Amino acid sequence: MKSLRTFFFVISILSLHGLCYGEAENGIAPMVKTEQEALYSAIQGFVGNWWNGSDLYPDPCGWTPIQGVSCDLFDGFWYVTDLNIGPLHDNSLRCRQKVEFRPEMFELNHLKSLSFFNCFTSLHHPVTIPTYSWEKLASSLQSLEFRSNPRLNGKIPTIFSLLKKLQSLVLMENGLTGQIPPSIGNLANLKRLVLSGNRFTGQIPYSFGNLTELLILDLSRNSLSGYLPSTIGGLISLLKLDLSSNLMVGSIPREIANLKNLTLLDLRNNSFSGGLKIPLEKMDSLEELALSSNPIGGDLGKIEWRDMHKLVFLDLSNMDLTGEVPESMAEGMKQLRYLDLSNNNLSGNLSPKLETMPCVSALFVSGNNLTGELKFSDKFYEKLGRRFAAWKNPNLCFPMNYRKQVEFRLG
């Protein structure tokens, strides 16, 4: 009699939780039925109704896993924690031409990571990011990515600001437009913010200065304009800052030198001006610095280059720079591999000490007003080959050993 009561008790518990019975019978941790149905429906919205999850993947968190779906145990039951849609692998979930964000996707309330890669591509069926229900994922979602979706149009939903646990927001290579919502600056846990390769306009929000945990900020290849806010100096944890290929103007704020941990600073292809007034020497963690194609101007020799020991890549071409090429570059930048100073207004002699930089493998100084004679060794010219260029300096003399190297290469 006692065993009979136990049997009915177990059956009632299984019924209450709506479990997948096949899993329970095998002694495997079960999945809540509503969770499984929500997963199947959410995927169908992207890949099509032909996709019959219950037949193809009856145990999506167990012995019939779905490519792009990961699960984890919570209180003894399986829940979906990662959902990746798009052709990352041969057997990945691929989007149909006409996709839909079904409400069931937002019922996966243990979801930590959600990504869409090369999914929204149809010319005839443009897609916008839903502006509703994201708050249902606020307690779990840590990573959200829309990558390489050319027909993903519209604006960044302001409701994203409710995703307080978000650590990574990547909206890269899409067709998104409009201004970046200032409310994104309220996502205090963000460590990576990548909005590159869209058509965003307007200014960078001042509120971004609140993102003190941010490690990577990439807003490159948009149409952002206006001034770079001084609050950028508040991103004290930042390692990489890429604002290249925008329409930004004005002086680079001195506060940017507060970013002591920065290893990459890329401001190429904007319209920054106002001279080299940033104390770059204080940014002694920099490994890559690219300021080219900005009418910044200023004297190249005013920077204490000898203090920038970790620089590997330095591109200061097309910047209207004046003055001489300082010997302090050779004295301090022992790790430097790439140096481009071409198409400026630099004058004076080119110091042979530049040859003493042990790692340098590319040096470009064409298009300046350099004078005197090049005094590098044959070995230096052989080492750099075509990666050395000093053309279009009208008063610069080229020694015979350099001419022979050029004639040999041109053959």
Task: Annotate the PLM regions.
Residues 1-411:
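Plant-biased, solvent-exposed loop and capping regions
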